[in-house]
Amino acid sequence: MSGRCNFLQFLVSRRSIRKFKDKPVPDDLILRILDAARFAPSAKNSQPWEFIIVKDRILKEKIGKIHKWASPLLGAPLAIVVACNREASPTSYLVDCANATMYIMLAAHALGLGTVWIQSLRNVEEIQELLKLPEKLIPVAILAVGWPDESPSPKRRKELKEIVHLDKYGRYWMST
């Protein structure tokens, strides 16, 4: 039972990290993270994701100029772009790739690395062009990845009684 509790504690301990140490992430750790991500669930086991590792400083700067909230990329040793094949999973590619993205974030956290999810379907065509992605691959997520140089406090989360409904919306399960 304690293993389950430890896993739940692990889940709630993850934070978005926006400041990183000037220390490279070894390639074997990057590959371990991406190896875990490929086991994320996807509709009909379509696995519509591809991962682009971006280490080039100039390329990270170019992404930073394209995307409004990409400043954490500039201080991170690398970025991982999750590109989704919308043809492989036309009705659920966004959810599928969100699953893979979360697996990346959790695997990185398990290895002591920090991440922050930057991309949210903004400037898709510009990022596709910059990374030479074919039209069918949509950059769903850009993650800054590195060794944390901050320890953010937990942000306020809504109480369960505010978000859990029973049988139909508006019938709060945990009403006070």
What kind of feature is each model-predicted range?
Residues M1-T176:
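Acidic, surface-exposed loops and disordered segments
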